[in-house]
Amino acid sequence: MSMTASSSTPRPTPKYDDALILNLSSAAKIERIVDKVKSLSRERFAPEDFSFQWFRSISRVERTTDNNPSAATTAAATTTVHSSASSSAAAAASSEAGGTRVPCVDRWPFFPFRALLVTGTAGAGKTSSIQVLAANLDCVITGTTVIAAQNLSAILNRTRSAQVKTIYRVFGFVSKHVPLADSAVSHETLERYRVCEPHEETTIQRLQINDLLAYWPVIADIVDKCLNMWERKAASASAAAAAAACEDLSELCESNIIVIDECGLMLRYMLQVVVFFYYFYNALGDTRLYRERRVPCIICVGSPTQTEALESRYDHYTQNKSVRKGVDVLSALIQNEVLINYCDIADNWVMFIHNKRCTDLDFGDLLKYMEFGIPLKEEHVAYVDRFVRPPSSIRNPSYAAEMTRLFLSHVEVQAYFKRLHEQIRLSERHRLFDLPVYCVVNNRAYQELCELADPLGDSPQPVELWFRQNLARIINYSQFVDHNLSSEITKEALRPAADVVATNNSSVQAHGGGGSVIGSTGGNDETAFFQDDDTTTAPDSRETLLTLRITYIKGSSVGVNSKVRACVIGYQGTVERFVDILQKDTFIERTPCEQAAYAYSLVSGLLFSAMYYFYVSPYTTEEMLRELARVELPDVSSLCAAAAATAAAPAWSGGENPINNHVDADSSQGGQSVPVSQRMEHGQEETHDIPCLSNHHDDSDAITDAELMDHTSLYADPFFLKYVKPPSLALLSFEETVHMYTTFRDIFLKRYQLMQRLTGGRFATLPLVTYNRRNVVFKANCQISSQTGSFVGMLSHVSPAQTYTLEGYTSDNVLSLPSDRHRIHPEVVQRGLSRLVLRDALGFLFVLDVNVSRFVESAQGKSLHVCTTVDYGLTSRTAMTIAKSQGLSLEKVAVDFGDHPKNLKMSHIYVAMSRVTDPEHLMMNVNPLRLPYEKNTAITPYICRALKDKRTTLIF
């Protein structure tokens, strides 16, 4: 059969999608992974491997003045802890005396484990194996990055209460451990406890001890915290109750099968850290897994050639942070002979071959060569030439603005944003807006930090200078270094939080009422600002407020750095897209089942607000209005009864009928109801006004909506005459909510079909903007404002795995978002906190909650809560570094490798090119394969050997 089709014969449309065929072809072998994991997870450790409560004697306290480890042993009070009282006393004594908890490596048992290696090209189906494991086995699913974890949550369709976490969160890592892990002094101190030099790690026992020592400061802190909690529980209850409480400490107690995605970004020693904490938590809780002597089975998923793990060290004295490449888990399992033999990698390696993200054969063949380090052919290099475009075009923000720019460094990203902002200021200034970023510094903690970091210093460094130098550590580096930040930092003193609260309380008592500034249940919860953890600021401490401003672009492509709480309040898109969502129940289907009632209520509110569009569209004629009036409107008891009461209500002399012009019951939940007579002053603005929701009666001579309806029934929408605004979910049963939704949906679809028929299909292409039970005003400075002063919607979250469009910001109260005031200084709250508004791929609008983060610094073994930042948790998808794009699928990509790139690596080239889903939408400033680049040749022989090994499981 000839493979050349006739030019006159049209190519038949394939019955099945290429990606589906590729996934089906690999399904059988993917199922074998389940059998392999089952076999590995059946391993048991021997009863004599662990002594009773071994975890209580793995460390001791050494005073900082002691230089001799053996001498310190006799001075320590916690070699073996026999009671909760002695443990607490020792911990307190060590803290006061500047003691450091050091390991007793001679008392450490060996922690056995099993490992399965799952690698492959980008988009080859590694995630499919995780889906199969999650569906068939009881396992703990994690990722090394937030993006990887949230991507798995979306793929596995996890509910909001069961989101996939990062492996660091699973074993107990929190923000205050960042400086502990980075401390150069701690790592230098622990060098003396190593059992051997790296080249002498000839046994798995030696390797495990040295790897755990590399992370010991964090391990010791987590262990101390858990032991103190266990001892407090044991003192107040039985040992069994204490064990049961500890069993809920970590997901590592749920299963001995632990899946870690994107392991190529995790340093080698983290594998042993995960193994250690599996045994620690299960031994502490005396769980079923520990009683059955289950050995942990770690499934390491990722690509060793497209990622690299970095390790950093921070010096408090010089305030310098050094970053260098480390050995990642995947490379260690592939190259380290000790791990290869112990884990039997030859028999426990699954390799995915073909790229399913992009099904172009030539492009997939190129990626395969790059992934496995096979020498490239000349035709591969020539093939990449087709993607080259002039550098000036790629660096011009106005050229191919829909494409995501990828750069090697943050400096290049920042330069691109500056060019973009300058260009927008000239042509589309209305798209730019800036918002404040707050940093509340505790003066006492900062002073103590300066004294610990530089005891001989004459005076502490100015706090604003310290903030500028440590901005990358205080606030997420990738999030902020790419944005256009103001060069000026405003510094001002804050009143003590207790004084602000007292003033507010006296004001409330004088004027009456409570109220919440940023939404939720109201009341005065500022006092909770003092109630946090062991590093919380004292109520009487003085604080300094540092403020800088960050510039955003309306309509730009953005993402978030972590799962962020948000509220769905509206929809913005085309009428056709909205109808498609209704017909397929797309929004309902993607909502977790426990939130189903809220989803039905939200879409009902959107439908109610969207009904006005049929009467105000540019295509609406009198003939269409007559046809629309004939559409059947079924009775909905919960809405029609209220409508009847409205019609029967007497006229009010004040011109404001409390039924027609009521304040929404939802809007009073914040404690500050908006009077109907209160006017809103707007400059240049666009108003989406739904007549039945309008509260405006500014001109006494103007004809009101009600009067207009009295004069002509043709322009009176019978929908709004029959139904009142849907009440809140608390007033309806689930059945009533679903009935209301189906009724509104059917009416909307019938009206849509009628308009499509009468307009010849043109109505579907019109833009549609609808908000949940609200009238909305778009101001010239990108501010979105509700005419009631508040928004109401469904509580949800936005994911780092998704891309969103920035629509602006709002300063209005968001009633569905719980208050975060207890974490923010009350004086900052009084200034008002703006929230960003994002639109997802379907068109739904989210109000993003503010991001509040506490920066805890560790110096000389002491943790200090130095500052709290309030920002927006946003990262740009318009432009980013190649490293930041790891794990993302992008539709259109423009890569700028620079004019004379230094330290260019094959991993950079591979990650940048493999992000795109279609090579037709890829462009680069140069052909990087024609430039000198660092090849990952060290690991290539091992991969080639595995490809030829019959024991390796290959999945095409």
Curated annotation (Swiss-Prot):
Residues given in the record as ATP binding sites: 120-127
Keywords: ATP-binding, DNA replication, Helicase, Host nucleus, Hydrolase, Nucleotide-binding
Gene3D superfamilies registered for this protein in UniProt: P-loop containing nucleotide triphosphate hydrolases
Functional description taken from the UniProt entry: Component of the helicase/primase complex. Unwinds the DNA at the replication forks and generates single-stranded DNA for both leading and lagging strand synthesis. The primase synthesizes short RNA primers on the lagging strand that the polymerase elongates using dNTPs. Possesses helicase-like motifs and therefore may act as the helicase subunit of the complex.
Protein family: Belongs to the herpesviridae helicase family.
Entry EC number(s): 3.6.4.-
Feature: compositional bias, Low complexity: 667-678
An MF annotation (GO) of this entry: helicase activity
InterPro entries: DNA_helicase_dom, HSV_HELI, P-loop_NTPase
GO cellular component: host cell nucleus
Keyword Endoplasmic reticulum recorded: no
GO biological process, one term: DNA replication
Name of the protein this chain belongs to: DNA replication helicase
CDD domains recorded: SF1_C_RecD
Region of interest: Disordered: 658-694
Organism: Human cytomegalovirus (strain AD169)
Alphabetical list of Pfam families matching this protein: Herpes_Helicase (PF02689)
